[in-house]
Structures are given as C-alpha cells and as structure tokens.
From Swiss-Prot:
Organism: Porphyromonas cangingivalis
Family: Belongs to the RNA polymerase beta' chain family.
Binding sites annotated in the UniProt record for Zn(2+): C741, C815, C822, C825
Molecular functions per Gene Ontology: DNA binding; DNA-directed RNA polymerase activity; metal ion binding
Lineage start: Bacteria, Pseudomonadati, Bacteroidota, Bacteroidia, Bacteroidales
Protein name: DNA-directed RNA polymerase subunit beta'
Gene that specifies this protein: rpoC
Cofactor: Mg(2+); Zn(2+)
Protein role: DNA-dependent RNA polymerase catalyzes the transcription of DNA into RNA using the four ribonucleoside triphosphates as substrates.
Gene3D superfamilies for the chain: 1.10.132.30, 1.10.40.90, 2.40.40.20, 2.40.50.100, RNA polymerase II, clamp domain (4.10.860.120), RNA polymerase Rpb1, domain 3 (1.10.274.100)
Entries under CDD domains matching the protein: RNAP_beta'_N (cd01609)
Origin: domain of life: Bacteria
Length: 1159
C-alpha cells in the first residue's frame, strides 16, 4: 500500500490510501441555491420565526417559494421589511418603480429588494441586529399590557439571548446552508448482495435525491430556464434537503419501495433507539455477565454465590496478573491459555483474588437504587447465581426463571464504594420511607409464626422453668412441646432500657426466637407475623445499629427455614373448609334481589338504583360469608389450620383468595370497551368456589377478569417507567450542598385527614425533620425541641401525645441554598436513620421513591357516581382537654327542642372553635363547626374534658330556617324539578320529595320564608338531590331544618386514582372540570340565572365585589349569605393549581401538590 499511496486510479477515480479514511473523511454537496435548515424552522420553538418575528405559517410560505419577502422597501410606500407579497403584487411593484431603481447597488437605501425562498431568509437574518432586538423585546416584555404578547416576547427573547451568548461562534444567517455535509462512506454503506442487487443505507437514497435535484437545477440555470420551472426545482431541492436531515418531522415523508419512511440523519440520533441512548449511554460493558438466579439460603447477608466459571472469566486479568507475579508462567499469552484451560492453580488464585473484591448484582427493571447492590462473591459449582433470600424484596426478584446481571467494580474507589455504601447488609432500610425492606417473607415467616404460636393443651403446658437452658433441655427430652404455654425466667429490659430478669408466660418456640435477638432489645413475647417482624427489625436497627441487625436477620432466616421444614406445613383439599351457612346466605341474597327486582318492575326505583342495590346485596353476602369462614378457619385445629396459618402470618395468600377457594368467587368485572364509563361489575355473581368447581359459564366470566388484569399490568409498567424517567430528569440536580442555609422559613405541618380518618399522623410527618421554632408543650410550657434541632422519635411521640396540632418544620420547598438544598431543610436520610450528609443526591432518591411503587398503582381513572364513601364522621365533637372555648366567625339563630330547652343553631359556614388552656393561653384543640350544627356552649365558656361542644348530622347537609314564618316553594313542579320516592319499606307509605335536575334550565327551585304580611324574609336555593322535610305552607321557627341533602351525593365526579393522578399533579395540569374558586373573603349572594349560568357575587367586608358565572350543571357548594374565604371552591370539581397560586400564593400550591401526591 505504501508503494501505491497517493496514486489515483484513472478508471474509477479512487485514491489508494489506508482503510481508515473511509471512516473519517467527510464530503459535501455545494448547493446551487441556499437552503434553510429544517432543524431551525420545523422544531419547537421555531428559531428562525422567533428571530425574524414572522409567524411560522408565513415563514413556510417564503421558504417553500410561495411568497416573496420584502427585504428593503426602498421608496415604495406602505411596505416594511419582512412583509409578504404574492407573485402579482411583486410584479406590480416592480412595474411601478422609478426607472433604474433595480440597477442601483444593493446597499443603496432607496432600492426596492424582495426575494423568495431561503435566499430571502438569509438576507433577512443578515440584517438582524441582535443587541437592538434584545433591547426592544425586553421593553416589550416588561411594558406590554396584554399577557399573550408578553409571553410571546419572552419566548423570542430566549432565542435571541442564546444567540447573543454564543456570539463569535455562530451567526443567525448560518441557519441557512449553502453547503451540506455528507457523512463518511463507511457510516452509510452500500453492500452488494448476491444476485446483483444492493442493500443500501437509507441515507444514500435521501442523499441521491438531493444530488439529482441539485444537478438538475444547475443544468436548468445554465440553460436559462423560465422562472416558474426554476422556482419549482428550487422548492424540490429544499424539500429533498429537509428529508435528508429529518424525514419524520413533516407530513409526506419520503417512503421506500416497501412503503416504509426512510430513516434520515435525525432519526438515527433521536429517541430510545437513537445513537445517544442506544449506543453511547446504553453500551454493553466489559467485566459483566448474566445468569439465572436460584435461592441461596447458606450465604450470609452480604454474600452471594457466583458460578466459578463465570468468576474465572470476570476476574481474568486479575488472575493473569497473579499467575505472572507468582512466576507460574512467563508471558501473558501462556497465562491466558492456562486460565482458559481452567487448571487447578487457577482456582487457588481465584479464591485469593475475590477476597475483598465485591461484585454488583443488578436485576432489570431497576426502579430504585436498591435494584443494584454489592455482594461478596463465594465460588460455587453449577451455572446459576445464588441470591440471598432476604435481598429479594429490594430486587423484586423471585426464582421462577429471573435473570440477573453481574458487574465488577474495577478501580479502588469503586471497590471501596461498593463495600461501604452498596453492600447488601448496609441497605436494610428502604430509602423511600425508612421502613425495613429486608423483611423475612414466605417460608421464613411461616416457620417463625409456627413456632411462636401457642397451643393450650400441648404437652407440658403450665410447667415453670428457672431459665432458658432448662426449658431447652426439657424440650429436647420430649417433656414439653414447642407450642406449650410455659413460665420461664428470662432476661428483659424495662421501659427505660435497663436490664431486668422476670418470669413470663411464653413457649419454647419463642425462647428459640429470642436466642437470635440481640441483647438490649428485650424479650419478644408475641406471635410473629410479617408485620410484627417488620416492626421488630425496625426496633433492632434503632437499638443496635445496622451491623448487629444483619446478623440478627441471618439468624432468623435460618431459624425460619429450619422450623418451616420441621413443622412440615402443607395443606390438602380437606383443609379448605366450606361454611355450612353458605347455602342459607345465598338463598337470602336471592330473596333480596327478587324484592329489588319487583320494586324496579313496579317503578319505585330507577334502573341505576336497582343495579347499585343488587351489587350491594351480593357484596354484603360475600362479606358475611367471608367473616364466618375466617372465624371457622381460625378455630379449626386450634388455629393450626395450615391455610389459615399461611394467610394469618402474611406468608402467602390473602383473605380474598381463601374466600374464593372456600366461600364464593363473588362479583366479576364486566367486559368493557376501554374508556367507556358505567357499570364495571356483572350483577350476577359467581356463587361457586374453587373447591366445588365452576360451571362453564362461570369459568368463562372469570377468564375475562384474569386476562384484563394481565394486560393492564403490562401497560402499567411502561407508563410507570416513563413517569420515573421524567421525574429523574427534573430532579437530578437537587443535591445536598451545605449543612445549613440559615433560612427562617418553613412549612406548617399537620396531620392529613380524609373525612375523619387520619391518613398520615403528625408523628409520621415531623419525624426526622428539623423544627423552625422552639416547640413548647402547651400544658407545661417546657421546650420539647429547640429551634434547628432534629425531631427524633422521643420528641415526636411527646408532640403527638400533647395538644399541639401543627409544627412548623424546615422543608426543601423553603430552603434558601443557592444550589441544591441544605441538610437542615432536608432532615433525616431515611435509609440510614440519621441526618443527611452533604453530597447525597436527594432529588433522584425522591424521584425513584415515587416512581418505584408506580407499578402497584392503578392505571385507570375511575368514573364513580358519588360512591357513598362511608363517611365515618362523629356526630358529637368533644373537648379533649379542659379549657376556655373561643369561636371565630360565629353566626347563630336560637332554637328550642321538644322539651323546650334552648340551644343555638350555627348558620355561618366558617365558624372555627378553639379550646385554650387557662394558664398558658395556648391552643389545645381546633375544629371547624359545620353549618347546621347545634351548639351547646357560648364563646368564653369553660369546658371540661369530654363535654359535647356541638353536634352535627354527619350524613346530611341541611338548610336551616333563619327566620320564623310560612314556607313558600318556587319552581317546584312534580316530575320536572322534583320526584317522589318511596322508601324500600313500601308498606309504611313513607314518601320523600327529592329535587332532580330539570330539563328546563330556567327553572330554579327555591324555598322562601314569608312573614304574616306575605313579604319574603329569606330565600334558599334548593340544590339537586335535596330532600324536603317540610311542605308548602308549613309554618317554621328559627333553627328548624327545612331541607336535607344526603352527603353521599356530595362526593361525585371522576375520582382520578393512581398513576394518572400522580402524573396530573406533577405536571400541574388543569383538570377537565375545574372548580370555580372564590378569590376574596366575603359574603355570597346568588343572582339570577341567565343562559344556563347562575350569577354568584361575593362581597368582602370592605365592599369589594367579585362576580362569577357558574353553569347550572355544576353543583353549588355554597348557599345564599354564606361567608367564604379566598381559595374556597364555589362549585364542585377539582381545584386548579393555577387558581391556588393566583389566590393564595406559592406556599399553598406546594402544600396542595405535596399532600396530593402523598395521598
């Protein structure tokens, strides 16, 4: 080759040189006319359009040779640079120009210049003065009155600023190309196939079109072809170059013979399969392998079994080095030969090499950081990796053929990091919530549950022993059974953690378990299920630290397996008990359904109600049967029924599954088109169970639900992975950068309640966070936590038990670090149990913690017409402490009950009560007093503990008469605005009048109270679903209930659940039916109805007014004369985050989003 280098073949024009130039020499195509680069006018934001200030549509018209663009108006009146002209207008202007105007130099200011195509764009871009443009846009963005134009100016400014930032490197006019590059030939190869055909890269095809059109255009220009033909050819050249760079971004992509869009330059770079994500970031790496996993019960928690052939290959270079050092071989080549032959000396060296050199195990999909952990390898025979059973939960692994990848950390730093941070025995806590994640499961739990369960009449029950040893001897001797309740002197710790020795009633099995428990934890004397074990492990970590816990876990793992094996727990079909009561319950169910059907046929209930009642009936039958079944199972064989033990311990199986085995299968899902709402359950349930066997029809119905479940899961995984990816993308730069940012701001935290059920207690929400202020006990006045201190378990418990309802804590949302966040604002690192260290990537941890459980969330949006979500609110509100009652915003009317005792009825909607400690003047409890409550105390009264302060109706919202007089109903017409319903107990003849939605939107049902002269004193609007308590013409006293609105109908609409809800919150999307929100505090007055909208006016105490139009289809959440606060919804629907931001400011939005996601 050297001899012929540089010689060019005279036949084919190829130069003789080395092969590698085929990979590095670029070519180019010189274009006859400039061409705009598609990346700069087809991408969003449209860079060229933003710089020139031309709309995208018009820009396309210029680029694709449809319109002329004025570049310099010259002497022509009424034209500006950048205006568009049609062909006719252009020719007219040319004709009207003074003689010789077109012969002037281009820089003469009076010359008229207009061009078409990319040339015009090139000239316009050359004339852009970036600094001047930037100045103008800034002025516009700050001064312009319209929001739309302000936004537009800011978007343009971004593009302008990026060009200004790269001044000297890039000019705007370079977005138009005169030359296009061609990538080296080896990267778009042409391979001859046998048969004389060629397999070619798509790029060649696209490039060919560019060259053909370019050459044709050159020929036409030389031949002086007419403008029309030239313009068409130029347009085609522009299109060819567009598809060469990006063939997917526009309609009408170039197709190949097989009608597949050709893959352009951009397509091969972008997306998951593109060059970056597939080949640069997603490379396969050396020093790695993968194999099937099997369970490894022998290794310790930080070890895994590695097949020796795999290890020999992974550690090959290390082994070769040792072979050379020991002088067994002289050259690397011979060393490699020995390693390949796997000679006996290789295994010795391998044992030596792997000491202290951990491997990383990874199971796909890696949803959170515990999906990759480090283990110390042990060489094993066979070809499968042995995984420690306790590590399975973190990897979400099981042994039904899962595979795992092994990677080898090479550098000393990597090895150190793997040993210190990633070793499996250090990762016992889940970083998402601080709960132990290495919890024994399945067999281990079953074994431990079995030996800690007591059996009253077992052999040796009631014996007393002076110590553990004696009891063990008796057990080994067969004098006492493992389950027998016996009394033993044991070592324990008291409440303050001091060691004591006392007599407890326990069993031999529990003594065995306590042998594994580290000292200082105390004697654990209870039956062990999965939940109990999780709590114990958490407790052991707190008391003894991670190292001791790892040993404890290994010990209980061995004990659990051993005992599950010794217990010989299995079950057979006769363990599946079918309750005798099953038939009678089913008969009762059928009887009820018949009654419901006859009610429906007689027209007492609507079809929807019939459906709901039938579903309720069968659900009730199912629950009853399930309860009986569980009771029977738990009593069978003194609680030693294998199925019951497996379920009760949490090892395997759920109540649901056992119910299907021996109760009834229950209601099944209905085959549905996706996206249609309506009834999701078939109303005739499957009444057989798996023990009895299903009929063909029942089997067929079952298969539908099963298949739907599987397909949902598959869809869910992809959706959830994408959510995680977006979360990591936005949060990866949030890192703990300093110890303390010194902010004085924080978030006020209180417990989250749904109705009256506490979802997250105050203890959970403040544990491990840092308090902003001193937290003072309201009763004693002592400081529980100083400002800037971490709230630990002890302090959190004191706060939880005291009357304190909210604590202001430091939060990442209010942190004032310049970059990242500070340790004080973040609080405790949940995976370690102490304050977070500098450098922790808390953003990614947070993203993973939300993304990882995403697969368990549901995918669908539930369409439920108000499910009466059993609102278990109390009727009475009691004082929890003695103190003085204070009430804000109270409006009441006086009323008397049947016995004539006076009480007060609250008619304000914003009454808030507080009970205050007499001495420290600190608030002990706060509570909202709902409208219509009966109040038993006056503000300023002293209340005692457990006094009833007020009573309210938890099941109905009410409308209260605020005046005395006669009732008059307006627009209340039977079967138009109200219907009559009969109670299910028809014989009693109890009728109810219920307001319905009328077709006539102008009717608005209301009730007025008139005085003796017939003047209207008060008018109340009647919402849909309201039940009358009084009738027309009745006389009422103040405080009487006029109308009841059942609360179950108040909860309605779409309950967006699961994954879509989380996505919706993070993107702060505006919901489909937003609620209308009050912007100011004030009194409500309802205006008249016009065009199907009701006018609502809010007047503040200062006289400020705001008007809102609320569609009649929406339910009003307020009544005439209510007092509302800013940010309260006036109609049903979801509150838009944007509204909260506008009305209550950024902190409220943060609260709303955080609480929403945590739900």
């Amino acid at each position: 080759v050297l001899r012929y280098r540089g010689i060019v073949c005279d036949r084919c024009g190829v130069e003789v040189t080395e092969k590698k130039v085929r990979r590095e020499r670029m070519g180019h195509i010189a274009l006859e006319v400039p061409v705009a680069h598609i990346w700069f006018f087809r991408s969003i934001p449209n860079k060229i359009a933003y710089l020139l200030g031309i709309p995208s549509k018009k820009l396309d018209a210029i680029i694709y040779y449809e319109r002329y663009a004025v570049i310099q108006p010259g002497t022509v009146e009424g034209l500006a640079a950048g205006d568009l002209l049609t062909e006719e207008e252009y020719l007219d202007i040319l004709d009207s120009l003074p003689e010789g105007n077109q012969d002037l130099e281009d820089d003469a200011p009076e010359k008229f210049i207009a061009k078409i195509g990319a040339e015009a764009i090139y000239d316009l871009l050359c004339r852009v003065d970036l600094d001047k443009l930037s100045y103008e846009l800034r002025a516009k963005a700050s001064k312009d009155s319209s929001q739309q134009r302000k936004k537009e100016a800011l978007k343009r400014l971004q593009v302008v600023e990026s060009f200004r930032a790269s001044e000297g490197y890039s000019r705007p006019e370079w977005m138009v190309m005169k030359v296009i590059p061609v990538i080296p030939p080896e990267l778009h190869t042409l391979v001859p196939l046998d048969g004389g055909r060629f397999a070619t890269s798509d790029l060649n095809e696209l490039c060919r079109r560019v060259i053909i059109r370019n050459n044709r255009l050159r020929r036409l220009i030389e031949q002086r072809a007419p403008q029309v033909i030239l313009r068409n050819e130029k347009r085609m050249l522009q299109e060819a170059v567009d598809s060469f760079f990006d063939n997917s971004s526009k309609a009408g992509a170039v197709k190949s013979d097989s009608n597949r869009p050709l893959k352009s330059l951009t397509d091969s770079l972008k997306g998951k399969q593109g060059r970056f994500r597939q080949n640069l970031l997603g490379k396969r790496v050396d020093y790695s392998g993968r194999s099937v996993i099997v369970v490894g019960p022998e290794p310790k928690m930080h070890e895994c079994g590695l097949p020796k052939y795999m290890a020999a290959e992974l550690y090959k270079p290390f082994v070769i080095r040792k072979l050379l050092e020991r002088g067994i071989v002289k050259t690397v080549k011979s060393a490699r030969r020995i390693v390949d032959k796997k000679g006996p000396e290789v295994w010795d060296i391998l044992e030596h090499v792997i000491k202290g050199h951990p491997v990383l195990l990874n199971r796909a999909p890696t949803l959170h950081r515990l999906g990759i952990q480090a283990f110390q390898p042990k060489l094993i025979e066979g070809k499968a990796i042995q995984l420690h059973p306790l590590a399975c939960t973190a990897f979400n692994a099981d042994f039904d053929g899962d595979q795992m990848a092994v990677h080898l950390p090479l550098s000393n730093e990597a090895i150190l990091e793997a040993q210190m941070l990633m070793l499996a025995s250090h990762n016992i806590l889940n970083p998402a919530n601080g709960a132990p994640i290495t919890v024994p499961s399945q067999d281990m739990v079953l074994g431990l549950y079995y030996i800690t369960k007591l059996r009253k009449d077992a052999k040796g029950a009631g014996l007393v022993f002076y110590g553990r040893e004696e009891a063990t001897i008796a057990y080994n001797d067969g004098k006492v059974a493992i389950h027998a309740p016996i009394k033993v002197m044991v070592d324990d710790v008291d409440a303050d953690g001091n060691p004591i020795r006392h007599l407890v009633e326990t069993s031999v099995g529990r003594l065995m378990f306590n042998e594994c428990v580290p000292q200082g934890v105390g004697y654990i004397n209870s039956i062990l299920g999965k939940k109990a074990l999780r709590d114990i492990i958490g407790h052991v970590i707190k008391e003894c630290g991670i190292a001791k816990t790892a040993k404890f876990l290994d010990d209980i793992k061995d004990l659990g397996y051993q005992m599950a094996f010794k217990g010989g727990l299995s079950f057979n079909l006769s363990d599946v008990l079918i309750p005798k009561e099953k038939d009678t319950l089913i008969q009762e169910g059928f009887a009820e359904v018949d009654e419901i059907m006859s009610n429906y046929n007689m027209g007492f209930i609507t079809n929807n109600e019939r459906y709901n009642q039938i579903i309720d009936t069968w659900t009730h039958v199912n629950t009853c049967l399930s309860g009986i079944l569980m009771k029977q199972l738990s009593e069978d064989n003194e609680g030693f029924n294998s199925i019951f033990m497996m379920m009760d311990s949490g090892a395997r199986g759920s109540k649901d599954q056992i119910n299907q085995l021996s109760g009834i299968r229950g209601l099944m899902a209905k085959p549905q088109k996706s996206g249609t709402e309506g009834r999701t359950l078939l109303e005739n349930p499957i009444l057989s169970n798996f023990k009895e066997g299903l009929s063909v029809l029942e089997y067929f119905i079952s298969t539908h639900g099963a298949r739907k479940g599987l397909s949902d899961t598959a869809l869910k995984t992809a959706e959830c992975g994408y959510l995680t990816r977006r979360l990591v993308d936005v949060s990866q730069d949030v890192i703990v950068t300093e110890e303390d940012c010194g902010t004085l701001r924080g978030l006020v935290t209180e417990e989250i309640k749904e109705g009256d059920v506490v979802i997250a207690s105050l203890y959970e929400r403040i544990l491990g966070r840092v308090s902003v202020h001193d937290v003072i006990h309201p009763n004693t006045g002592e400081v529980i936590v100083k400002a800037g201190e971490e709230i630990n378990e002890k302090a959190a418990t004191i706060i939880q038990d005291s009357p304190i309802t909210n604590v202001e804590i430091r939060s990442v949302l209010t942190c004032e670090s310049k970059k990242g966040v500070c340790a004080k604002c973040y609080g405790r690192n949940l995976s370690q149990g102490h304050m977070v260290h500098i450098g922790e990537v808390v953003g990614v941890v947070a993203a993973q913690s939300i993304g990882e459980p995403g697969t368990q969330l549901t995918l669908r949006t539930f369409h439920t017409g108000g499910i009466a979500s059993n609102i278990g609110s109390e009727k009475y509100v009691k004082a929890k402490y003695d103190g003085i009652l204070e009430i804000d915003e109270l409006r009441t009317v006086d009323a008397k009950d049947e016995e004539g005792n006076a009480y007060q009825v609250v008619v304000g909607r914003l009454a808030e009560m507080r009970v205050i400690d007499e001495n420290t003047r600190m608030t002990l409890i706060t509570h909202h007093i709902p409208y219509g409550s009966k109040l038993y105390f006056k503000p300023g009264d002293k209340v005692k503990k457990d006094d009833n302060i007020f009573e309210s109706d938890p099941f109905n919202a009410v409308i209260i008469a605020e005046e005395t007089g006669k009732l008059k109903f307006e627009d209340v017409v039977e079967n138009v605005t109200y219907k009559v319903e009969y109670d299910s107990n028809v014989s009693a003849g109890h009728k109810e009048h219920i307001i319905i939605e009328s077709k006539d939107k102008n009717l608005s049902p209301s009730v007025s109270i008139l005085n003796s002269k017939g003047d209207i004193l008060r008018t109340y609007n009647l919402p849909v679903g309201a039940h009358f308590v009084k009738s027309n013409g009745d006389s009422v006293k103040t405080g009487d209930v006029l109308v009841k609105i059942p609360r179950s109908t108040l909860k309605g609409g779409d309950i967006t659940g699961g994954l879509p809800r989380v996505t919706e919150l993070f993107e702060a999307r505006n919901p489909t039916n937003p609620a209308i929100v009050a912007e100011i505090d004030g009194e409500v007055s309802l205006g008249r109805v016009r065009r199907g909208n009701r006018e609502v006016t809010i007047t503040s105490k200062l006289g400020e007014e705001r008007k809102y139009l609320i569609p009649l289809s929406k339910q009003l959440l307020i009544q005439e004369n209510d007092y509302v606060r800013a940010g309260m919804p006036l109609s049903d629907g979801a509150i838009t985050p944007a509204d909260i931001l506008a009305i209550k400011g950024p902190n409220a939005v943060q609260d709303y989003i955080v609480n929403g996601v945590q739900d």
